[in-house]
């Protein structure tokens, strides 16, 4: 399986049948392999679900072994918005490849992520033309509320999880 983003893939146990996909997006400085560890417990409860964990499309600016969806070292909100939209475009290309390969529609795909991956999942989940099954986010936020208000197209079900120290 070759996609536009290098990915760690965790297939369902004992089944070739794939009915659902969970796309797990790592946080700033992480990679697909790191976040794929979540799938090891989840897959016991989600038969026929494939977990696809891409690396960000850019090397991380402060961690040369990790990746990023956009650079967080700059504090310019316009720059961050522009870079996050570039990342969204790359992720949309990636998601379309997954949909084609596994013959899935958005309603069979969950977007999930940690920190910066959560931020990307929220934006993708709310600006898509077609509603995703859900977004499950950990320790993230909306990148730019004003921009998202303008671009929001669907009301995807969202579960956001934060610790009491976030």
Residue ranges and their predicted role:
Residues 4-104:
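Serine-hydrolase catalytic machinery in alpha/beta-hydrolase-like enzymes
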Residues 103-113:
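Alpha/beta-hydrolase fold nucleophile elbow
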Residues 130-142:
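A conserved short beta-strand
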Residues 63-69, 140-159:
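Flexible "cap/lid" loop of the alpha/beta hydrolase fold
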Residues 159-166:
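Short beta-strand/loop motif that positions the catalytic acidic residue
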Residues 37, 123-127:
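Active-site signature of alpha/beta-hydrolase-fold catalytic machinery across serine-
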Residues 19-20, 107, 153-158:
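Short, proline-enriched alpha-helix->beta-strand connector loops that line the catalytic pocket
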Residues 112-117, 121:
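Gly/Ala-rich beta-loop-alpha elbow adjacent to hydrolase catalytic centers
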């Amino acid at each position: 399986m070759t996609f536009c983003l290098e990915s760690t893939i965790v297939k369902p146990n004992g089944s070739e049948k794939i009915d659902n996909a969970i796309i797990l997006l790592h946080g700033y400085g992480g990679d697909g392999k790191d976040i794929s560890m979540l799938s090891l417990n989840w897959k016991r409860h989600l038969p026929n679900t494939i977990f696809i964990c891409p690396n960000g499309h850019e090397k991380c600016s402060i961690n040369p072994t990790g990746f990023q969806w956009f650079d967080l070292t700059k504090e310019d909100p316009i720059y961050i918005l522009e870079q996050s939209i570039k990342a969204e475009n790359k992720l949309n290309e990636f998601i379309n490849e997954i949909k084609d390969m596994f013959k899935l529609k958005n309603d069979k795909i969950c977007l999930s992520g940690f920190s910066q991956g959560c931020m990307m999942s929220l934006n993708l989940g709310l600006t898509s033309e077609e509603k995703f099954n859900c977004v499950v986010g950990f320790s993230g936020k909306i990148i730019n509320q004003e921009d998202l208000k303008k671009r929001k197209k669907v009301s995807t079900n969202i579960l956001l999880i934060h610790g009491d120290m976030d």
